[in-house]
Amino acid sequence: MFCLCLSLLGLLLCWPAATRNLLELKVECPHTIGLGQGIVIGSAELPPVPLAKVESLKLESSCNFDLHTSTAAQQAFTKWSWEKKADTAENAKAASTTFQSSSKEVQLRGLCVIPTLVLETASRTRKTVTCFDLSCNQTVCQPTVYLMAPIQTCVTTKSCLLGLGDQRIQVVYEKTYCVSGQLIEGNCFNPLHTIAISQPTHTYDIMTLAVHCFFISKKGGTDDTLKIEKQFETLVEKTGCTENALKGYYACILGTSSEVVYVPAMDDYRSSEILSRMTTAPHGEDHDIDPNAISSLRIVGQLTGKAPSTESSDTVQGIAFAGTPLYTSTSILVRKEDPIYLWSPGIIPEGNHSQCDKKTLPLTWTGFITLPGEIEKTTQCTVFCTLSGPGADCEAYSDTGIFNISSPTCLVNRVQRFRGAEQQVKFVCQRVDLDITVYCNGVKKVILTKTLVIGQCIYTFTSIFSLMPGVAHSLAVELCVPGLHGWATISLLITFCFGWLAIPLLSMIIIRFLLIFTYLCSKYSTDSKFKLIIEKVKQEYQKTMGSMVCEVCQQGCETAKELESHKKSCPHGQCPYCLNPTEATESALQAHFKVCKLTTRFQENLKKSLSTYEPKRGLYRTLSMFRYKSKCYVGLVWCILLTMELIVWAASAETINLEPGWTDTAHGSGIIPLKTDLELDFSLPSSATYTYRRELQNPANEQEKIPFHFQMERQVIHAEIQHLGHWMDGTFNLKTAFHCYGSCIKYAYPWQTAKCFLEKDFEFETGWGCNPPDCPGVGTGCTACGVYLDKLRSVGKVYKILSLKYTRKVCIQLGTEQTCKTIDSNDCLVTTSVKVCMIGTISKFQPGDTLLFLGPLEEGGMIFKQWCTTTCQFGDPGDIMSTPLGMKCPEHAGSFRKKCSFATLPSCQYDGNTVSGYQRMIATKDSFQSFNITEPHITTNSLEWVDPDSSLKDHVNLIVNRDLSFQDLAENPCQVDLSVSSIDGAWGSGVGFNLVCSVSLTECASFLTSIKACDSAMCYGSSTANLVRGQNTVHVVGKGGHSGSKFMCCHDKKCSATGLVAAAPHLDRVTGYNQIDTNKVFDDGAPQCGVHCWFKKSGEWLLGILSGNWMVVAVLIALFIFSLLLFSLCCPRRQNYKKNK
């Protein structure tokens, strides 16, 4: 019966992957590989293997890197297992003397028995180490395959295969977006264990990393510090033990890649920390694999045995069990200097360093360590797109890596490339009718697809007229403009080149239609009038003479003659229309009328008696004799059309943007007579800047004007914070440990070394219903129920907002007086003449809120209104926290229940929550408020950022006192001279341009003003600059203009002497711009572009064409002359005109 119990427990090892034989071993690599000596590590859990097949297991490789052959060699192990004593009766009750252990020597290959200097020289010799470890019970073993490779293999290898038994392991090298760090909490973390000594705490971060350690035996030598067990005994303050002679050390790798850390090494903080954790958890801090989170084991009891089997006395001891294996079953004895390797399926060997004898050390140890370090700084992405088929091919790249990329309009497929430190991600956008929006590294990028379509139009037009590519390209640049402006350009060119042919042709078609329309209207009018007369006659007859219906056939008559004919013919059975005989009944007569062909005889006679309507011949003659072929008429219409089309062209080139942003205006700025106080009251989005510029005029003297410039920068949020620590996620484990004799304190259980655990013991069974049949009965034994959290990992940083402040920098230039101040809500900038106040802010943040960041700060975070800080329960937000003061574990509010069945092993049930707070949050992520940030700056106690989404708003009030000293302030000695340095970008409303201006300020020390980018007609962009005496460089970003625009740097109505022409808007690839950079509100009161401005713009465009590609002008003039010749041939002068002449 006991064997049946063991078999049932073995079924708990059913693995989800047992039905497939291809598993994945992932190796995470930074995407920039330097000349360091680091090692990358990856591991994979394999399905269980029957115990009988373990000795034949061999780790094979098809990878292209060099492998160390040392681990593939056969290694002698002592197999130490347990069994029921042979002299035990079949129905005997289990006791401490019921079972015994046995030992034998076996040869195993591929286990993690790593010789000296293998890992130490792996990076230098470019050799990789592969091995596997075993966790076994009495029936099966759980293999774990490890791969440790020089970090340079990240460059040479992408994928390969390993084989162990029937299983195939796909080794996948995956490059992260980290330049050189490890990916933890979505951040790229570089552990620097010495930084805590030399730097203040707010300059570095602390993260929790996994640690994989492998024991390396080193026999010989005189260095007693390598007697590792002595180091453990010192830590637990154990004395009086006979010296354990084993020499060796652990070689540890931190996280996914690091240099090798040697344990023990007292001069290394990391080594000391790992040694301390090994002392606390001698078998490891990773207790279970994921599929075995809820499982049971039965403790058989404590056994001793011999290793090697030839020993005369017992040299090893441990706890025998049946059920799910927990820790490694491979270890090494510490008593002798010669290494003795132990394989103990179904036995947890003694690892308590407080004991003196029969101790072992595991060959592999997995745990966690908290280390200080730096988080790599991220850079913004550059995104560009090219037109491809019906959609667009886009690519995003960043100098330091892309940690987050998404798009609501594109399919981001994560196909990525690395070029040095730069990471590139390619994706496809299926639609180009809308602008492409991409969120990359926390920044919103917008790619204007209108420019892509322009480029495709230019390419198509140039391809069609490929015989003259230069001319075709120049014409395409002018024609391929979207909207009314483009159609106006097309109509202008058609009118100029072919107007003398199109005008008479269209006139002829219009005249023909008018003639047809006139005739149809006349014909319709005649018939309708006749019918109207008939109806009126009928109505009058009915009023005077009575009914117009025949009494015999009941037919309605329209005239008196028709009624008289009915009265004479119908009573005699004769048709009144054709006079043919028929029956004198209503039905017969009505049937005859349907086939009679003369029923309209009386109407026709009446119509003939009326005079026929003749249309007036003058209308036809005027339309027919119109001289649409006259050169005078054609030339007049041609000139009028050109003029009107030029006006439409100029007017359509002006794009009025109703949303906050730049509006194209003419030169100069607005003038306000200061009759009363000037007051502005407005609401400004948090990410927007505001510029207001006017000239304040003295109402009493119009010659006295004071330049006034008001500048408000975007909002900065200042939060005083408290760092609560790192939120952790973990696997919930529920374990049942049962033994049928002794008290519950007789044995130690696995969860008792876990960070967070809860245990309840059901001691001494009082009934037969909860005992397996081989147990001794009631009054003894123990069922220990435990829950613990395993595989803890950091998922995010948590900050609590203690106080909030919203600030904006405000600058005022009034004449020569300049004042700047950073104001916050309910604060003001006050001068003798001006008062600026932030009255309030509409915000979604409140003091007491908790901010959670699941990655870099630039990725944004989540707002929690309720965050647990004390007495947290498992499943609450903030349930598991790693703080500077240590781990904070949650309370488990549930209760245990022991499930019993007669003659079976009892099991534990837990009725509380089994889902961590982090996993609950991910399942309901959309229910939490989120926010984005840009330009973050964080210290120990403060966090500052800018809201890029304009989700917050400030209420601003500005008052300028009318009692200004115009006599003093109107005299402005500041002299501004401008010149153009360079220009980048394209004209038009697509990608825009960047104009670099050189601005010289003289006669005063500083001056706050705005510099515009304008052509001769209007302005397209502005930049506020605080000029200082001497030369200043100002960058002005604008959008608009046309092919003839020469963009100049302008201040008020003064512009640079020369201008520069921007490129055509058809770049091969269009680069996205930052949405936040365009969120500006500019108001200088300059007049809108009027009729004079339109003609000026049109003239500049025509001059631009004339001064550009002269071949284009020549082709247009040639087409014009050709159309004149065709006009002369098709529309010659009239012959009679020639004779009269």
UniProtKB/Swiss-Prot annotation:
Pfam families: Hanta_Gc_C, Hanta_Gc_N, Hanta_Gn-B, Hanta_Gn-H, ITAM_Cys-rich. Belongs to the hantavirus envelope glycoprotein family. TULV has the ability to regulate IFN induction although it is not pathogenic. Residues 616-639 form the ITAM domain. Keywords: Activation of host autophagy by virus, Disulfide bond, Fusion of virus membrane with host endosomal membrane, Fusion of virus membrane with host membrane, Glycoprotein, Host endoplasmic reticulum, Host Golgi apparatus, Host membrane, Host mitochondrion, Host-virus interaction, Inhibition of host innate immune response by virus, Inhibition of host MAVS by virus, Inhibition of host RLR pathway by virus, Inhibition of host TRAFs by virus, Membrane, Metal-binding, Phosphoprotein, Repeat, Signal, Transmembrane, Transmembrane helix, Viral attachment to host cell, Viral envelope protein, Viral immunoevasion, Viral penetration into host cytoplasm, Virion, Virus endocytosis by host, Virus entry into host cell, Zinc, Zinc-finger. The chain crosses the membrane at residues 490-510, 633-653, 1110-1130. The keyword Glycoprotein applies. This is Envelopment polyprotein. It comes from Tula orthohantavirus (TULV). The keyword Membrane applies.
